[in-house]
Swiss-Prot record:
It is found in: Cytoplasm. InterPro entries: Ade_phspho_trans, PRibTrfase_dom, PRTase-like, UPRTase/APRTase. It comes from Lactococcus lactis subsp. cremoris (strain SK11). Coiled coil: none annotated. The keyword Nucleotidyltransferase does not apply. This is Adenine phosphoribosyltransferase.
Length: 170
């Protein structure tokens, strides 16, 4: 299946000069959505995953079906003020500004093997902050998976030696 057929391209969104890759058509097609999630599940099967972690909001959309298929839990990464209990946080640079991400401080147990799932790898700020959060709790990041990588933004440089899977490159 050619997943790029299910990605809408929007020029100059959310600001002038940005090309936005919209995954909504992929999610709206059950076969394409299932195919994408299954590809990530196949990548993760031999990694002995204990927990899937996904940044808000589209990391939830991709990460939850992956966690379900793997038979493991899902831990959300949220913006400040969105989680009701004690949190840890990490600040990062993104494509158009700076942001902070949080997780409940008990989301990951020391030694748990974690797969991080998100829709997009752009500048790498979100993934770097998510890795930092998981590792602050003693988790072991055993892989990362993305629907899309924007190659020219070089986000892979922030992943370092972490193994990762990408389904589509732009």
């Amino acid at each position: 299946m050619e997943l790029k057929d299910y990605i809408a391209t929007i020029e100059n969104y959310p600001k002038e000069g940005v090309v936005f890759r919209d995954i909504s058509p992929l999610m709206a097609d059950g076969n394409a959505y299932n195919y994408a999630a299954t590809e990530i599940v196949q990548y993760a099967r031999d990694k002995e995953i204990d927990m899937v972690v996904g940044p808000e909001a589209r990391g939830f959309i991709i990460g939850c079906p992956v966690a379900f298929a793997l038979g493991v839990g899902f831990a959300p990464v949220r913006k400040p003020g969105k989680l009701p209990r004690e949190v840890i946080e990490a600040t990062y640079e993104k494509e158009y500004g700076t942001d902070t991400l949080t997780m409940h401080s008990d989301s990951i147990k020391p030694g748990q093997r974690v797969l991080i799932v998100d829709d997009l790898l752009a500048t790498g700020g979100t993934i770097a902050a998510t890795i930092e959060l998981v590792e602050k709790m003693g988790g072991v990041v055993v892989g990362c998976a993305f629907l899309i990588e924007l190659d020219e933004l070089k986000g892979r440089e922030k992943i370092g030696n972490y193994v990762y899977k990408v389904l589509m490159h732009y």
